[in-house]
């Protein structure tokens, strides 16, 4: 199970967002020029040898065990080589930045992903992990939101009714093949 986590006390201000929209959720469309940006600060003030990789996950954020070359085009592991040293501050820190996709690593497949940053090219020395989504418009969804129809939820919850139109996608067993996740996203751009 992978979550959003920081494993070192000196790592602060971790942000993962769509490029150009700092307050956005980390979601981009497969095959477009959209990018995600990960930023974090290392308050130790020392320049560290960080690397990163991507893990493709299932709907429950467990590793999908698909071979990395099936979902990554390019190098499987890369150094974090975009950084800036602090200046004119009361204490020293280093700000690190990763943009995805990039020239070294591109996505081949949509899905749930975890970006894992680790030290000294040692995947046992994990520094942080952040979840994000890559999606593709494979289906069309038609939906409505209304007040809950079950008495226990009236006044506090909503009901979402929807239909999935999938003319170019074969779904033989919807209970096994389809998982619906409803997220309330902000419209901040």
Predicted regions and their residues:
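C-terminal edge beta-strand
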Residues: 129-133
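Conserved small/polar residues in nucleotide/adenosyl-binding loops
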Residues: 189
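Contiguous beta-strand segments within globular domains
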Residues: 6-56, 152-168
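Low-complexity, Pro/Ser/Thr- and charge-rich linker/hinge segments at domain boundaries
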Residues: 134-157
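Short acidic/polar inter-strand loop motif in beta-rich domains
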Residues: 59-61, 105, 119-126
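Ligand-binding face of N-terminal immunoglobulin V-set domains in extracellular IgSF glycoproteins
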Residues: 92-105, 110-120
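Extended, solvent-exposed segments with strong compositional bias
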Residues: 72-93
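Beta-strand-rich binding/interaction modules
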Residues: 52, 111, 172-183
């Amino acid at each position: 199970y992978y979550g959003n986590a920081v494993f070192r006390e000196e790592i602060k201000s971790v942000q993962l967002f769509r490029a150009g929209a700092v307050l956005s959720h980390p979601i981009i469309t497969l095959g477009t020029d959209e990018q995600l940006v990960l930023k974090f600060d290392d308050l130790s003030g020392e320049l560290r040898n960080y690397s990163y990789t991507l893990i493709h996950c299932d709907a429950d954020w467990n590793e999908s065990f698909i071979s990395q070359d099936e979902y990554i085009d390019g190098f499987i592991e890369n150094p974090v080589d975009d950084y800036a040293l602090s200046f004119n501050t009361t204490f020293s820190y280093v700000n690190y930045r990763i943009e995805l996709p990039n020239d070294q690593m591109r996505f081949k497949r949509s899905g749930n992903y975890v970006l894992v940053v680790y030290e000294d090219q040692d995947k046992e020395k994990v520094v942080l992990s952040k979840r994000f989504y890559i999606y593709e418009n494979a289906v069309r969804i038609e939906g409505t939101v209304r007040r809950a129809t079950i008495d226990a939820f009236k006044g506090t919850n909503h009901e979402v009714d929807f239909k999935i139109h999938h003319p170019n996608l074969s779904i033989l067993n919807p209970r096994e093949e389809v998982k619906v996740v409803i997220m309330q996203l902000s419209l901040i751009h």
